[in-house]
Structures are given as C-alpha cells and as structure tokens.
C-alpha cells in the first residue's frame, strides 16, 4: 500500500546540444597537454584551439560562475548540465590579464550571447597554451555526454556535445 505512495517518480531525460563557444579547431580532450583535462578529471568534453578571442554562450542557461581571474566561466544549461569553458592552460596564473568578462554570476544567457573576450597573443606568450577545454563539469550528475564529430567550428554555429540528463 505505501510502496507507491513514497515512490519517487523518475523524470524524463532531457537532452541539450552544446554549440561551440569559440571559433577554431577541435582538439580531442585526450590530446590536451594538461593531464587534469586529458585524463578527464574535470569531466567529459572537448577542447578548441581558438582562432579569435571571443567566447559566446554555448547553451541557453544561467551564468553560475565567472572565475575571479576571468580565465574560466561556468554556464548551467536548462537540463542542469554545467558547462565549464576554461580559456587556455595555466591561465589562472595571469590573474585576469588579457581577459574581459561581459557577464556576471546569475545572468541569464541565450546561445550566442557574448560571455568573455581574451587576447590570444597574451595567452600564447604568458601561459602554457591557448587551447580551451569545454567540459561538462558535473559529468557524474548527468546521464550521458556524447561528442559530436567535427574538426573545425564556428562559435554559435557548430554543435560539439550532446548532454542527456
């Protein structure tokens, strides 16, 4: 009798598509020259070798965190997937130099909204690499992450990941 009363209803899976937040060349995560990303310790995803210094929102959602050093941002999609865009490698050490945030924590964004801009020359001169991992940072809390096979992407146009949650 009480079995059905307390049964938690399983929700329907919701799939979202993540578009490229940066224009450039896709790099498989396993080939990123940083073991934290290459070994997927931060989560599943891909990376982009940027062709320009503009980052747009890859999903409709909410800005959860703009890192104080402006080298990374997390946007939460409508299905609760958290997309971490980490601009360059070892860029936290730049302490914000070369980065500009165009949004703040709590902002509601749509695909294509400008999130950040950065100076590629500064990053390539002072950091390890401009390669930018795009990670589902809460991979453990989503049902599935699928990479979409592409080699070159244009920000806001090409799909790079599907996330089912």
From Swiss-Prot:
It is found in: Cytoplasm. It comes from the Bacteria. One of its GO terms (molecular function) is kinase activity. This is PTS system glucose-specific EIIA component. Keywords: Cytoplasm, Kinase, Metal-binding, Phosphoprotein, Phosphotransferase system, Sugar transport, Transferase, Transport, Zinc. PANTHER family: PTS SYSTEM GLUCOSE-SPECIFIC EIIA COMPONENT. Residues 34-138 form the PTS EIIA type-1 domain. The record marks 71 as: Important for phospho-donor activity. Binds 1 zinc ion per glycerol kinase EIIA-Glc dimer. The zinc ion is important for dimerization. The active site is at residue 86. One of its GO terms (cellular component) is cytoplasm. The modification Phosphohistidine is found at residue 86. It comes from Oceanobacillus iheyensis (strain DSM 14371 / CIP 107618 / JCM 11309 / KCTC 3954 / HTE831). GO terms for biological process: phosphoenolpyruvate-dependent sugar phosphotransferase system. Coiled coil: none annotated. The phosphoenolpyruvate-dependent sugar phosphotransferase system (sugar PTS), a major carbohydrate active transport system, catalyzes the phosphorylation of incoming sugar substrates concomitantly with their translocation across the cell membrane. The enzyme II complex composed of PtsG and Crr is involved in glucose transport. Zn(2+) binds at residues 71, 86. The EIIA domain is phosphorylated by phospho-HPr on a histidyl residue. Then, it transfers the phosphoryl group to the EIIB domain.
